[in-house]
């Protein structure tokens, strides 16, 4: 018989949320850094065709 799961505590929920936010922050920082280097032409590791 199916039994409902226990409720996740607020602190655990908050911890998971901050981990997710931190990962998103670093991903956006990397993407912005890459975009900046591409726009200035300083990129050495990212290959793309210049028009």
From Swiss-Prot:
It is found in: Plastid, Chloroplast. One of its GO terms (cellular component) is large ribosomal subunit. Disulfide bonds: none annotated. Its main location: plastid. GO terms for biological process: translation. The keyword Ribonucleoprotein applies. Keywords: Chloroplast, Plastid, Ribonucleoprotein, Ribosomal protein. The keyword Chloroplast applies. Pfam families: Ribosomal_L32p. GO terms for molecular function: structural constituent of ribosome. It comes from the Eukaryota. Belongs to the bacterial ribosomal protein bL32 family. This is Large ribosomal subunit protein bL32c. It comes from Oenothera elata subsp. hookeri.
């Amino acid at each position: 018989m199916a039994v409902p799961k226990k409720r996740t505590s607020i602190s655990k929920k908050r911890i998971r949320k901050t981990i997710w936010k931190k990962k998103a922050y670093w991903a956006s920082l990397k993407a912005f850094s890459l975009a900046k280097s591409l726009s200035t032409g300083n990129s050495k590791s990212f290959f793309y065709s210049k028009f």
